[in-house]
Amino acid sequence: RKSLYQEFHGSTIPDVGIGYLYVDSSSEMMSNDDPSWKTLGTSVQLPKASQLLITDANLTPRSDNLDSYPGLKQWLGSPDAWRDILNSIVGATLGGQKRRLGRFLFACKAGNYREQVQTQVKLLQQSGETDVTFHPVLGLAGGTGSGSVIDAVAQLRDLYPDSPRLRILV
């Protein structure tokens, strides 16, 4: 997004058929005044419709009642182990460097993710072009991105099974 803005020297960016969905377990880079989104003196921050914060997911009640969440139960593991993990979390930024915690957070917000992806695809397809290529871009340093990449791709493919027209490139 910053590169496009820089390439067009701050002018109106032509309709290039790009949609964004920024998913994170930290709200740090989601505020309108976040300096990392500034280029050429202008904020190119994504609108709220292109952001998904995956915190505040009531993880403890979910881990204590896994029978009600069969999709989580398959891979989450022991509720006792999760109680220890969840009790050790400090502050509101829940993801940190824990891959399974990233998966857990993402799983709790998968419905929101699906809705926001569908909104982005509809906006892109309004031009009449129905083919879409998804490019999940994420951090693999051991935090929530590396924990949820497979789940994000699986949700995309579940939503859009027509792989020749709706490609996913990771």
State where each predicted segment sits:
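Segments that form or flank anion-binding pockets
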Residues: 1-137, 147-170
